[in-house]
């Protein structure tokens, strides 16, 4: 990786170029023809080859035909809904479960406002936001694992 020279704004030639509209894109390697003719086609062909390879090497599995009159004992949602499914399953009152599920997006919306006075980007210099993130991640993983377990072995919140 090469270091780029910072422009000298007191240079009259550079000021003349900036006045003509040649801004920060003037420095470095131009996009035409380098990126558009060489890099983009390689990325597009590589992505297409990966998709075709995945489609050929791992085709979609066709299972047994669906029977609308036979319902499985436990119906599980998709994997990304396991934590909120476990919240619903572990709380006895369904209204309380729905309110707890609604608190998940509200909590995610409030995360940026927890420590907005701290302008540092380093996580070690933002202990409150880092702690909230780590605790939230651990609770989400714990709830997701609990939802994947059978109903009789399911995790509880320790309250009921």
UniProtKB/Swiss-Prot annotation:
Electron transport recorded as keyword: yes
Compartments, record wording: Cellular thylakoid membrane
* Bilayer topology: Multi-pass membrane protein
Q: Name one GO cellular component term.
A: plasma membrane-derived thylakoid membrane
Predominant location category: membrane
Do the record's keywords include Transmembrane helix? yes
Q: Which PROSITE patterns match?
A: CYTB_CTER
Pfam families with a match to the protein in the record: Cytochrom_B_C (PF00032)
Gene Ontology molecular function terms on file: electron transporter, transferring electrons within cytochrome b6/f complex of photosystem II activity; electron transporter, transferring electrons within the cyclic electron transport pathway of photosynthesis activity; oxidoreductase activity
Instruction: Provide the alphabetized UniProt keywords.
Output: Electron transport, Membrane, Photosynthesis, Thylakoid, Transmembrane, Transmembrane helix, Transport
Q: Which GO terms describe its biological process?
A: photosynthetic electron transport chain
Q: Which InterPro entries match?
A: Cyt_b/b6_C, Cyt_b/b6_C_sf, Cyt_b6/f_cplx_suIV, Cytochrome_b_C_euk/bac
Q: Which residues cross the membrane?
A: 36-56, 95-115, 131-151
What is this protein for, i.e. what is its function? Answer: Component of the cytochrome b6-f complex, which mediates electron transfer between photosystem II (PSII) and photosystem I (PSI), cyclic electron flow around PSI, and state transitions.
Q: How does it assemble?
A: The 4 large subunits of the cytochrome b6-f complex are cytochrome b6, subunit IV (17 kDa polypeptide, PetD), cytochrome f and the Rieske protein, while the 4 small subunits are PetG, PetL, PetM and PetN. The complex functions as a dimer.
Record's family?
A: Belongs to the cytochrome b family. PetD subfamily.
Q: What is this protein called?
A: Cytochrome b6-f complex subunit 4
Q: Which organism is it from?
A: Nostoc punctiforme (strain ATCC 29133 / PCC 73102)
What phylogenetic lineage does the species belong to? Bacteria, Bacillati, Cyanobacteriota, Cyanophyceae, Nostocales
């Amino acid at each position: 990786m090469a270091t780029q020279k910072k422009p000298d704004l007191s240079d009259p030639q550079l000021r003349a170029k900036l006045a003509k509209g040649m801004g920060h894109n003037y420095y470095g390697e131009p996009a035409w023809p380098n990126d558009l003719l060489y890099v983009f086609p390689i990325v597009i062909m590589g992505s297409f080859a990966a998709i075709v390879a995945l489609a050929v090497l791992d085709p979609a599995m066709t299972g047994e035909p669906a029977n609308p009159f036979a319902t499985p004992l436990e119906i599980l949602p998709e994997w990304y809904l396991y934590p909120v499914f476990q919240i619903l399953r572990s709380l006895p009152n369904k209204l309380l479960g729905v309110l707890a599920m609604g608190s998940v997006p509200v909590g995610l919306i409030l995360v940026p406002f927890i420590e907005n006075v701290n302008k540092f980007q380093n996580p070690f210099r933002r202990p409150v936001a880092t702690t909230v993130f780590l605790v939230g991640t651990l609770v989400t993983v714990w709830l997701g694992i609990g939802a994947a377990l059978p109903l009789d072995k399911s995790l509880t919140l320790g309250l009921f």
